[in-house]
Amino acid sequence: MYPIKKFFLLISVIGFLPAGCVQNENKRSDPSVKSLASVPAWTKEAIWYQIFVERFRNGDRSNDPTPADMYGSYPDKIPKDWKTTPWGHDWYSHEPWLDSIKANGFYSKIQARRYGGDLQGVLNEMDYIQSLGVTAIYFNPLNDSPSLHKYDARNYAHIDRNFGPDPKGDVMIMDAETHDDPATWKWTSADKLFLKIVDEFHKRGIRVIMDYSWNHTGKEFWALNDIRKNGKNSKFVDWYNIIQFDDPSTPKDELKYEGWGGNNPYMPVFRKDIIPPDDKIMPFEGNLHSESLKQHIFSVTRRWLDPDADGNPADGVDGFRLDVAGEVPMGFWREYRKVVRYVNPEAYLIGEIWWLEWPDKLLDPRVFLQGDQYDAIMNYRWYRIARGFFGQADPVLTPAGFVQGIHGINRSLNIENLQAMMNVTSSHDSPRLSTSLFNKTMDKYNAKPSDNPDYKINRPDQLTRKEQMLLLIHQYTFPGAPQIWNGEEAGMWGADDPDCR
């Protein structure tokens, strides 16, 4: 696989001007400008496997989520007869408890589904994952969180309670800590199991990155609960954009704050200093407002990069996927890169740079790939062009249009960044590859039955499978690192989020 990829890589990059190669010093020192800007060599030959733990495998039924664990996620009230959903359940059929949920429609109600996937399930499938030939793992968020997706953190410093073997014991450990003091942080059973998994993957020559959102938390995040309790006197009050404080004299929770996407109460966003203040178009100059918030994020980052803090990052993760990265001011990312590279000069930073204006305008990533922020992005721009040609889907491309499109998105990129791109065909946020090709409408637009009753959700036909094979050949021989969304290797199909999960 590697020789053919290198051969096609050589052909594909003719006409690009590569930047000078830079060697990283593998020692704890302030990174020089050159070492800070370099792209980790291992990322250029990576084959990524993306794991969404809650939906991967249930290896330990004793840690399955309960309604109490889900408190703070949508929907708010879980019926008494709620149970975890059995594996193999028909996605569009209703569990006995589903219609008891007071929520608007099927897609709102299934946010309460839990399958019980956990880290033991990942550990049990190590041989299977290795057999796929992958060399790097991208974990969707693992931080403690009440939701199925974990982008609404309760606690950044710990692995989700239901991903480890002792949820109740882990909660006791977390509750005993001073959350803003890293000196008090302990290792929960879930934390230890994750570190074991990192070690096992490393023994097999497989790298590991974690997914974090430094843009927002969940409504039950410990700092927001402190604001809920102490109001204006909370020392974390400058972390968020607080609109109204809670009135402790009433039973109602009156706390209001800016949420992701506007008024989403389940994902409060951090306060940012945008330069200029009225700038509404990404990317943004500026920074996160609170210095104590940044230091907390940096402490969590160091914790996973070098768990025993001995100066050798071999026991830690190999980088981070950065959620909704374009919504966070670039000044923060410049600081963040320095923190990460100080601990591990070979750590990989990949940003989720996607929409400028949904559903048809994608954000130009060049400003993020100047050596001071990320090494690469999730390359949805590449997939749109590849789908238009190999799948003859909207926007349909001729061979000449395909070549023009590929050159258009790549010609201005540093060759090292291009080689490290994660070339994404499907993910937790988009239709699965075969379903995306089976439907010829615009990708990620009206791409599930609730938005388009004509959207095809049945088994893709043989023509689609042939288109899929051609696109995959292109993916594995094109500059960049191919990515597999868990389940794609088994031929799974599915519409847009959440049907793809």
Question: Predicted segment positions?
Answer:
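Aromatic- and acidic-residue-enriched segments that line the glycan-binding/catalytic groove
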Residues: 44, 60-81, 145-165, 214-265, ...
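Bacterial N-terminal signal peptides
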Residues: 8-18
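Loop/helix patches that line or flank the sugar-binding groove of alpha-linked glycan CAZymes
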Residues: 43, 59-107, 355, 404-408, ...
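The substrate-binding groove and active-site-proximal loops of carbohydrate-active enzymes
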Residues: 101-121, 154-191, 219, 265-294, ...
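Conserved, mostly hydrophobic/aromatic
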Residues: 51, 129, 139, 156, ...
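Active-site-proximal helices and loops of the catalytic beta/alpha 8
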Residues: 198, 202, 206, 215-216, ...
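N-terminal structural segment of carbohydrate-active enzymes
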Residues: 27-207
